[in-house]
Swiss-Prot record:
Protein name: ATP-dependent Clp protease proteolytic subunit
InterPro entries assigned to the protein according to its UniProt record, in alphabetical order: ClpP (IPR001907), ClpP/crotonase-like_dom_sf (IPR029045), ClpP/TepA (IPR023562), ClpP_His_AS (IPR033135), ClpP_Ser_AS (IPR018215)
Keywords carried by this UniProt record: Cytoplasm, Hydrolase, Protease, Serine protease
EC class name: hydrolase
One GO biological process term: protein quality control for misfolded or incompletely synthesized proteins
Compartments (UniProt record): Cytoplasm
Catalytic activity: Hydrolysis of proteins to small peptides in the presence of ATP and magnesium. alpha-casein is the usual test substrate. In the absence of ATP, only oligopeptides shorter than five residues are hydrolyzed (such as succinyl-Leu-Tyr-|-NHMec, and Leu-Tyr-Leu-|-Tyr-Trp, in which cleavage of the -Tyr-|-Leu- and -Tyr-|-Trp bonds also occurs)
Pfam family membership, one: CLP_protease
Active site residues of this protein: S96 (nucleophile), H121
GO function term, MF aspect, one: serine-type endopeptidase activity
Gene: clpP
GO cellular component: cytoplasm; endopeptidase Clp complex
Quaternary organization: Fourteen ClpP subunits assemble into 2 heptameric rings which stack back to back to give a disk-like structure with a central cavity, resembling the structure of eukaryotic proteasomes.
The keyword Lipoprotein appears for this protein: no
Length: 196
């Protein structure tokens, strides 16, 4: 069930679902697994808010275990494509593809709540059972290319070398807010809502 908010206007009462009300304040919620439908919704909201006023920041709240690389990269590409700065605020966790999205916010405007967590790792992939050897080789080559792309994005977003990212992402690498700040993925840990 989605909560409803009621506002008093000069013309009477108006009710909004909570997400529509947040959108009025340029807030987008990216929660749950990153998949095509969720990504399409986030992308549509980014494009709408940018078209509405590209001089104002957009606030993207992130709480995701990660998910689809292609869906996540579509969000990142849109964040980079639009003129509005996208502030990212990690709450709960940003893991896997979530770290790529959250760290791709506008430099100087990437935030994290004190008890949130970050996790990087290498991308996962596979081919179902009964797959031909040639298809397995193609899938493995694609996975290696994907890993290089993601490692380059994380290196660009953190200031670390690709080699450092590669080594740290070999297995699940969890970080607290303080560790994430020291690593360079965020710019500030927020104790209260001081976004402007």
């Amino acid at each position: 069930m989605i909560p409803v908010v009621i506002e008093q206007t000069s013309r009477g009462e108006r009710s909004y679902d909570i997400y529509s009300r947040l959108l009025k304040d340029r807030i987008i919620m990216l929660t749950g697994p990153v998949e095509d439908n969720m990504a399409n919704s986030v992308i549509a909201q980014l494009l709408f808010l940018d078209a509405q006023d590209s001089t104002k920041d957009i606030y993207l709240y992130v709480n995701t275990p990660g998910g689809s690389v292609s869906a996540g990269l579509a969000i990142v590409d849109t964040m980079n494509f639009i003129k509005s700065d996208v502030q990212t605020i990690v709450m709960g966790m940003a893991a896997s593809m979530g770290t790529i999205i959250a760290s791709s916010g506008a430099k100087g405007k990437r935030f994290m709540l004190p008890n949130a967590e970050y996790m990087i790792h290498q991308p996962m992939g596979g081919t179902g059972g009964g797959t031909q050897q040639t298809d397995m080789a193609i899938a493995a080559e694609h996975l290696l290319k994907t890993r290089k792309t993601l490692e380059q994005i994380l290196a660009d977003n953190s200031g670390k070398t690709v080699e450092q990212i590669h080594a740290d992402a070999e297995r699940d690498y969890w970080m607290s807010a303080e560790e994430t700040l020291a690593y360079g993925f965020i710019d500030e840990i927020m104790a209260n809502n001081n976004l402007s």
